[in-house]
């Protein structure tokens, strides 16, 4: 399945929730969900009855779109989550949260996960003092993500940092804004992920 390149706001309307794909715009009244809270398309306002399979599929698609993951990679994450000890659905969300691009976004260096992925690929960050340009790197407790010196004057990064300071960051992370670095204090648990996700539906879908 190819990566989606169309309007991001259509995805939010399709999933009937804010996926925070457009950065700061998602926190304003310009958000598509706030303006048109129904699916895109000619018949979008007449939401049809959805089967159990359809509900499970939509939940999986929603999580994939939140984190910007293609189907093949998402299935690999699920298989790894299923092998780990604990609850499979919670393991899945923890693995997704611990991606380098997501941590960069959560720390406030980027306004969206898409922007964070681009910044990582363009070598703007180090991980524990070493070059890190692979968005899918899994972070562990104690890892330090730091913005390179040459990148600290980029306007969009500083604007994002100012915005996240006002909103706050997850408890499992720590941001040292003046030093342009963040630390993974602990691994994320289910209570740290506040998005309205029903991960058990994804487990049921892949268990068929």
Swiss-Prot record:
GO terms for cellular component: small ribosomal subunit. InterPro entries: Ribosomal_uS4, Ribosomal_uS4_bac-type, Ribosomal_uS4_CS, Ribosomal_uS4_N, S4_RNA-bd, S4_RNA-bd_sf. Residues 98-158 form the S4 RNA-binding domain. Keywords: Ribonucleoprotein, Ribosomal protein, RNA-binding, rRNA-binding. One of its GO terms (biological process) is translation. Signal peptide: none annotated. SMART domains: Ribosomal_S4 (SM01390), S4 (SM00363). The keyword rRNA-binding applies. PROSITE patterns: RIBOSOMAL_S4, S4. One of its GO terms (molecular function) is structural constituent of ribosome. It comes from the Bacteria. Belongs to the universal ribosomal protein uS4 family. PANTHER family: 30S 40S RIBOSOMAL PROTEIN, SMALL RIBOSOMAL SUBUNIT PROTEIN US4M. One of the primary rRNA binding proteins, it binds directly to 16S rRNA where it nucleates assembly of the body of the 30S subunit. Part of the 30S ribosomal subunit. Contacts protein S5. The interaction surface between S4 and S5 is involved in control of translational fidelity. This is Small ribosomal subunit protein uS4. It comes from Geobacter sulfurreducens (strain ATCC 51573 / DSM 12127 / PCA). The lineage of its organism: Bacteria, Pseudomonadati, Thermodesulfobacteriota, Desulfuromonadia, Geobacterales. The gene is rpsD.
């Amino acid at each position: 399945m190819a990566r989606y390149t169309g309007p991001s706001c259509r995805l939010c309307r399709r999933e009937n929730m804010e996926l925070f794909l457009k950065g700061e715009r998602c926190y304003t009244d310009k958000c598509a969900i706030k303006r048109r809270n129904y699916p895109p398309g000619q018949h979008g306002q007449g939401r049809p009855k959805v089967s159990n399979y359809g509900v499970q599929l939509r939940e999986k698609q929603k999580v994939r779109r939140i984190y910007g993951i293609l189907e093949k990679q998402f299935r690999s994450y699920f298989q790894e989550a299923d092998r780990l000890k604990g609850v499979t659905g919670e393991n899945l969300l923890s693995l997704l949260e611990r991606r380098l691009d997501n941590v960069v976004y959560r720390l406030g260096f980027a306004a969206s996960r898409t922007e964070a992925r681009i910044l990582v690929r363009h070598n703007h960050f180090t991980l524990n003092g070493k070059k890190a340009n692979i968005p899918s790197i899994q972070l562990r407790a104690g890892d330090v993500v730091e913005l390179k010196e040459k990148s600290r004057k980029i306007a969009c990064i500083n604007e994002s940092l100012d915005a996240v300071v006002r909103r706050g960051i997850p408890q499992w992370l720590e941001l040292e804004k003046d030093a342009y670095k963040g630390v993974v204090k602990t691994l994320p648990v289910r209570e740290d992920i506040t998005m309205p996700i029903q991960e058990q539906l994804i487990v049921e879908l892949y268990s068929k």
